[in-house]
Regions:
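N-terminal secretory/targeting leader peptides
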Residues: 23-129, 138, 147-149, 153-348
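Positively charged n-region of N-terminal signal peptides that target proteins for export
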Residues: 1-4
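C-terminal motif of bacterial Sec signal peptides marking the signal peptidase cleavage site
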Residues: 18-21
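Alpha-helical scaffold segments in soluble metabolic enzymes
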Residues: 141
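Bacterial N-terminal signal peptides
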Residues: 8-16
Length: 348
């Protein structure tokens, strides 16, 4: 009830903002008479995401908002609602598509499933490979397909949180067989479900905002998330055993409503695009800087963190190889695209 009431209040606030969100009021927002953007109008950009205060996505979005306002002389104001205030990631993307809000960030691929190709298990092994994949011509092509399917514009594609790890409340996971019989929470993403099923686990789809309580009440035995998410959402309070398997990363598309985007003057689109690029770079930098500290918080709380050897990681990799062929068969990517991604990774 509390969650529904909060969402209701936020939606009332948003309803009052919608009229301003596409405003082309020609009054100047800069002091004095030297505003280079005078006459271009004023705009409000409402953006939602699911992460809490302190998470790299939260911090980088606040930086983006400040940069856009400063560089447009206050003509574009970005209002960021984090921590799932505007709903689940799927609900937020739906709001972007219909124009209730102007943007959202998050690993939401229901409307653009081919972006899932970048979430194949053990696809990349380091930051350079992740950056190469997300900045590739293949990524640009897939984003263009997603834009056409959703009527949105993807103004940045960065990392959603870093390498993803396994955890559960029953026993240590040191080898693939240790996952057999565990009920693992997922966000409904096909490649995560496929991966856990290949390892012998069952899966249950639970919204991110509800995950802490689901783990606490044993609705799910375990979950997978990056260290920064585990630390930020305090999952370590309700999970005992963690395995640093680094099995997957997620793209983090920044969706913007296409109609609103095209209504902006070209000068503002250019500035917002540049600020989004800076935001993505800052986000990835924060992720890399915060992983070890976040992991240490988990250790200090008293949880067991197992770090597999290279040989043990190879066993996990071998166990999920079939996921690649399964994704090709389901049309997430073609065999040629799979080879293109493998070539990109091998070249870095």
């Amino acid at each position: 009830m509390k969650k529904l009431l909060t969402l209701f209040v936020v939606m009332i606030v948003l309803a009052g903002m919608v009229f301003a969100a596409g405003s082309s009021d020609s009054s100047s927002s800069a002091a004095g008479g030297d505003d280079e953007f005078a006459g271009l109008g004023n705009y409000t950009m409402i953006v939602g995401h699911a992460q809490p205060n302190g998470n790299p996505r939260y911090v980088s979005m606040e930086s983006f908002a400040a940069d856009v306002e400063a560089k447009t002389n206050g003509h574009v104001k970005v209002q960021v609602f984090g921590n799932g205030q505007l709903g689940t990631e799927k609900e937020m993307l739906e709001q972007v598509v219909i124009g209730t809000i102007q943007g959202m960030r998050g690993g939401q691929f229901d409307f653009s499933p081919r972006l899932l190709m970048f979430t194949l298990p053990f696809l990349a092994q380091n930051r350079a490979q992740v950056t190469a994949l997300l900045s590739s011509d293949l990524a640009k092509k897939v984003c263009a397909e997603a834009e056409e399917a959703t009527g949105t514009v993807i103004i940045n594609l960065c990392d959603a949180g870093g390498w993803r790890q396994f955890s559960n409340g029953k026993h240590p996971i040191t080898k693939p067989d240790d996952l057999k019989g565990l009920k693992m929470r997922t966000n409904g993403m096909k490649t995560i479900d496929m991966t856990f099923q290949a390892l012998g686990a069952t899966t249950t789809s639970i919204p991110y905002a509800d995950l802490y309580m689901a783990l606490k009440t044993s609705v799910a035995d375990g979950q997978e998330n990056p260290w920064v998410n585990v630390e930020g959402m305090k999952f370590y309070e309700v999970q005992k055993y963690f395995t640093e398997v680094n099995y997957q990363f997620h793209p983090d598309p920044f969706y913007v409503n296409g109609t609103w985007w095209n209504s902006l003057p070209e000068e503002f689109r250019t500035i917002i695009s540049e600020c989004a690029t800076d935001m993505g770079n800052y986000n990835d930098q924060l992720i890399d800087e915060n992983q070890e500290a976040a992991k240490q918080v988990v250790k200090d709380y008293g949880c067991q963190v197992y770090e597999p050897t290279a040989e043990e990681i190879k066993a996990f990799q071998d166990a999920v190889l079939g996921v690649y062929d399964q994704c090709v068969k389901e049309g997430i990517l073609t065999q040629d695209e799979l080879q293109e991604m493998l070539d990109i990774v091998a070249s870095v």
